[in-house]
Amino acid sequence: MTVSRVCLLLLVALVYLDCCYAASIPRNFDPRLSEEIVMAPKKRPFCNAFTGCGRKRSQGPPGMPAQDLRTKQYLDEEALGSILDSESAIDELSRQILSEAKLWEAIQEASAEIARRKQKEAYIQ
């Protein structure tokens, strides 16, 4: 009698464990969410005044593959490096920068003079 009770208790325990193991807790599972989507960080689009919004920073400009973009950038850097290596080019660039600065100062002085004249005319009237 005790052996049959032990066997019966063991059988009930095994059935109970099997039911617990096989049971699953229902949860709301969205099939659109996969591990790749959840684990990968989302990038926000890069916005600026020149290109606008709607593309990610890692994307190249529309119509230009990334490899071509890298090649073009490398060639531009190489050309710029060879130009800056020559001393005469550096001197010419310095002269251009100084002339642009002088032109900017002249424009600012002319704008200030025009503003003073307008203010003087408004005061007289």
From Swiss-Prot:
Task: Provide the GO MF annotations for this entry.
Answer: neuropeptide hormone activity
UniProt lineage:
Eukaryota, Metazoa, Ecdysozoa, Arthropoda, Hexapoda
Signal peptide position in this chain? 1-22
Q: State the protein's name.
A: Cardioactive peptide
Predominant subcellular localization, coarse grouping: secreted
Q: Which UniProt keywords apply?
A: Amidation, Cleavage on pair of basic residues, Disulfide bond, Hormone, Neuropeptide, Secreted, Signal
Q: Is Disulfide bond one of the keywords UniProt gives this record? A: yes
Q: Indicate whether Disulfide bond appears among the record's keywords.
A: yes
Subcellular location as annotated:
Secreted
| GO CC annotations, alphabetized | extracellular region
Q: In which tissues is it expressed?
A: Abdominal perivisceral organ; major neurohemal release site. Expressed in 116 neurons in post-embryonic central nervous system. Nine pairs of cells are observed in the brain, 4.5 pairs in the subesophageal ganglion, three pairs in each thoracic ganglion (T1-T3), three pairs in the first abdominal ganglion (A1), five pairs each in the second to sixth abdominal ganglia (A2-A6) and 7.5 pairs in the terminal ganglion. Expressed in every ganglion in each post-embryonic stage, except in the thoracic ganglia of first- and second-instar larvae.
Whichever gene encodes this chain, its name is CCAP
Q: Which InterPro entries match?
A: CCAP (IPR024276)
Cysteine amide modified-residue sites: 53
Q: Which domain of life is it from?
A: Eukaryota
Q: Which GO terms describe its biological process?
A: neuropeptide signaling pathway; positive regulation of heart contraction
